[in-house]
Design a protein with these regions (language model features):
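Basic polycationic patches enriched in arginine
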Residues: 2-4
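Pyridoxal 5′-phosphate
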Residues: 15, 19-442
């Protein structure tokens, strides 16, 4: 792993990496920000998105961790599907530009690059919490003394509800069956070591470790590789909600031996409100027909799907967890956005993201008159692009003032303003504008 060092020298802030012999200075100036934008090889991707308007101008949008912007190509692709439906009717399942029978196949290779998987290990389907329930029916199979689930305290509420009700469905008391790992006294973040130690301490009572890959509130990225290794060492499965990780941080789910994961697509993947979710199932499970999964005709092997026979025969891979055919209109935006990711490359996006978020962090550290602290990890490798500002007071007033000045951020109770400089469409000048407006709020 590359080591990064942060130094403050005078009015400049330096981001240093082992791969560079010269530090890169950050400066709180418009000239600096615009200069960085001129050198940004990904800058043109900004022009491929539609921005909401405020007083006749584009807003400064830092809310991609809640809902990503609309790619301009969505309208064209949606109209294309509508035309194909009008032109072909039912024959569109095989004659449409993207034949609907095999529509989900067009997504797998591109998603696999983003999450570090084999293409048969991923599929776009359903929505996040639906997928979490579906996957837990396969991977949470409590028996005897092995029935406990380890998760982080303060997980996104939908994850909490899913885990709680799955535990109840199996006849267990959530207060006994769910082990929540909390931050140490006085801290905001959960240490990876504390999760790993809790797994080892609980030992063979653990059936499943279920963590949010990036915590929605703090923006902390957990060490999924070592958490997975710890889970496997006690005979438990490891699964992850990657809602805030997918499209944000490159991952290696296959190489990390993750058992399963699920995500939404409407945040960093820019696939529209309520957009289709996705799942990862490691090939050792996806190719095991004896592993229980709920059946549906789209999970059945394709060659016998329309023979209408009794007996569910799962196809190989994550696609066998599908139940129904792809919701084409709901997946159009996903198709458009994944094309942009394929062109930009997740690793190149991450390189820009590290510097862009580092610049925003530096600018926030220059604000001395407002009572907030950044609770997101300072180490770049432990976060994505989100920074969470925890306000001691006046937080909602500051958030409202940002909104009134054409800046779209995100408010999360209690008392946090979340901002996410997304490398596909945010710029260094955006970061400077945020700093400029925030500096003037009293």
């Amino acid at each position: 792993m590359r080591k990064r060092i942060f130094l403050t020298l005078g009015h400049q802030y330096y981001f240093c990496a082992k791969i560079s012999s010269m530090p890169i200075p950050y400066e709180a100036s418009l000239d600096y920000a615009q200069g960085e934008d001129r050198m940004d090889t990904l800058y043109s991707f900004r022009e491929r998105f539609l921005f909401p308007q405020h007083n006749g101008a584009d807003v400064t949008y830092f809310c991609g961790n809640s809902l990503g912007l609309q790619p301009k190509s969505v309208e064209y692709l949606m109209n294309k599907e509508l035309r194909d439906w009008a032109r072909y009717g039912v024959e569109g399942h095989f004659q449409a530009t993207y034949p609907w029978f095999s529509y989900h196949h067009f997504f797998s290779e591109r998603l696999a690059k983003i999450v570090g998987a084999e293409k048969d290990e991923v599929v776009a389907m359903n929505t996040l919490t639906v997928n979490l329930h579906v996957l837990m029916l396969s991977f949470y199979r409590p028996k005897g003394n092995r029935y406990k689930i380890i998760m982080e305290a303060g997980a996104f509420p939908s994850d909490q509800y899913a885990v709680e009700t799955q535990v109840r469905m199996h006849g267990y008391d959530p207060n006994d069956a769910i082990i929540e790992i909390t931050p140490q006294a006085g801290a905001h973040l959960i240490e990876d070591a504390d999760i790993i130690n809790a797994i080892k301490e609980a030992g063979d009572s653990v059936a499943l470790v279920m963590i949010g890959g990036v915590n929605y509130y703090t923006g902390q990225f957990f060490d999924l590789e070592n958490i997975t290794r710890a889970a496997h060492s006690v005979g438990a499965y490891a699964g992850y909600d990657l809602a805030h990780a997918v499209g944000n941080i490159p991952m290696e789910l296959h190489n990390w031996n993750v058992d399963f994961a699920c995500w939404c697509s409407y945040k960093y993947l820019n696939s529209g409100p309520g957009g289709v979710g996705g799942i990862f199932v490691h090939e050792r499970h996806g190719n095991d027909p004896t592993l229980f999964r709920l059946g549906g005709w789209w999970g059945n092997e394709e060659k016998t799907r329309f023979k209408m026979q009794k007996g569910f025969v799962p196809q190989k891979g994550a696609a066998s967890w599908q139940m129904s055919n792809a919701p084409v209109f709901n997946m159009v935006a996903h198709n458009a956005s994944l094309d942009l990711f394929d062109k930009a490359g997740i690793k190149e996006l991450r390189k820009k993201s590290l510097k862009l978020t580092g610049y925003m962090e530096y600018l926030l550290q220059q604000i001395k008159h407002l009572p907030f602290e950044i609770i997101t990890p300072a180490e770049p490798g432990r976060r994505g692009c989100q920074l969470s500002m925890l306000f001691k007071e006046k937080g909602r007033e500051v958030f409202d003032a940002l909104t009134q000045n054409g800046i779209v951020a995100d408010w999360r109770e209690p008392n946090v303003v979340r901002i996410a400089p997304v490398p596909l469409y945010n710029t260094f000048e955006d970061c400077y504008r945020f700093y400029e407006v925030l500096s003037q709020i009293k």
